[in-house]
């Protein structure tokens, strides 16, 4: 199996439709041992989701912005496993005044809060668990991303934070590679998750993907994204670090929208030329 015997810490499981939940479930199917983390009021929800996995997973409390809790999680994992083979970073938060077309009005405190939780936390988690990762086998950190190469409507400081996340990923790759630890991101297309429901303008983004993705895009299926995460968490990706793997049906590769009917007209033209 792809992840046989690997020990993984997975953050961000809040519903059984979340990408993180699908990663945890698929990881167990591929032979991994999994521990989840939860925080605040969401901790109880994460514990409920842990019971729905193939094998119930333990849940550790973790506020990723609290150094004491990071240290406590590291201690628990050290006692339990003694090493760590992989981490899924599925953590993001943006205050309400940092999204929804309020980019110019967002106060610095909200921008900083978005950066700290959505981006800096990747570094914080990696640094806190590095001694365990160094003892792991081809250890891998995977973070969930949304393409930050362009400005999306209403995404605002979430987009800025994702851009920071992508930069942090590159610096982690630089600094952790010599210590045998990889760091990569998976830039997913939009999915109907709890996180997406909090994004004003999500329906517009969803329509872009449904209309333009060359491979098509199923808003209700996190499995392709989860499987990409499993690949990066596995030894098969042992020579890959600092990468952003787009799992979005190909939308990131398009320079402009394809007009409705253009693809079918082009195909019809090719057929006519072939016939002649």
Each PLM stretch: what is its role?
Residues 12-21, 92-130, 134-178, 190-193, ...:
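Catalytic loop of short-chain dehydrogenase/reductase
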Residues 51, 60-71, 75-80, 86-114, ...:
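Conserved mid-core segment of classical short-chain dehydrogenase/reductases
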Residues 2-36:
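Canonical Rossmann dinucleotide-binding motif of NAD(H)/NADP(H)-dependent dehydrogenases/reductases
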Residues 241-276:
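Short C-terminal tail/terminal secondary-structure segment
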Residues 10, 88, 142, 183-186, ...:
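Hydrophobic structural elements of the Rossmann-like NAD(P)H-binding subdomain
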Residues 74, 122, 126, 169-170, ...:
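Short-chain dehydrogenase/reductase
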Residues 120, 185, 203-240, 245-249, ...:
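C-terminal helical subdomain
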Residues 28, 82, 134-135, 174-179, ...:
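A short hydrophobic alpha-helix cap/turn motif
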């Amino acid at each position: 199996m792809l992840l046989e015997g690997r020990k993984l810490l997975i953050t961000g499981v809040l519903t059984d439709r979340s990408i993180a939940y699908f990663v945890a479930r698929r990881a167990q199917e591929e032979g991994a041992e999994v521990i989840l983390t939860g925080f605040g009021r969401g901790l109880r929800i994460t514990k409920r989701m842990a019971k729905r996995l193939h094998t119930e997973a333990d849940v550790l409390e973790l506020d990723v912005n609290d150094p004491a809790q990071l240290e406590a999680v590291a201690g628990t994992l050290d006692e339990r496993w003694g090493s760590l083979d992989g981490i899924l970073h599925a953590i993001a938060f943006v205050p309400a005044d940092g999204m929804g077309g309020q980019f110019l009005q967002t106060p610095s405190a909200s921008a900083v809060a978005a950066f700290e939780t959505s981006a800096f936390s990747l570094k914080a988690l990696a640094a806190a668990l590095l001694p365990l990762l160094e003892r792991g086998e081809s250890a891998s950190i995977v973070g969930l991303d949304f393409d930050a190469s362009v400005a999306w409507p209403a995404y605002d400081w979430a987009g800025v934070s994702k851009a920071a996340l992508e930069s942090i990923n590159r610096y982690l790759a630089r600094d952790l590679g010599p210590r045998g630890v990889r760091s990569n991101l998976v830039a997913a297309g939009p999915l109907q998750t709890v996180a997406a429901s909090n994004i004003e303008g999500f329906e517009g983004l969803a329509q872009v993907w449904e209309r333009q993705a060359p491979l098509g895009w199923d808003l209700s299926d996190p499995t392709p994204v989860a499987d990409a995460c499993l690949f990066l968490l596995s030894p098969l990706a042992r020579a890959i670090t600092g990468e952003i793997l787009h799992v979005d049906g190909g939308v990131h590769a398009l320079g402009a929208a394809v007009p409705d009917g253009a693809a079918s007209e082009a195909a019809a033209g090719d057929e006519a030329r072939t016939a002649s």
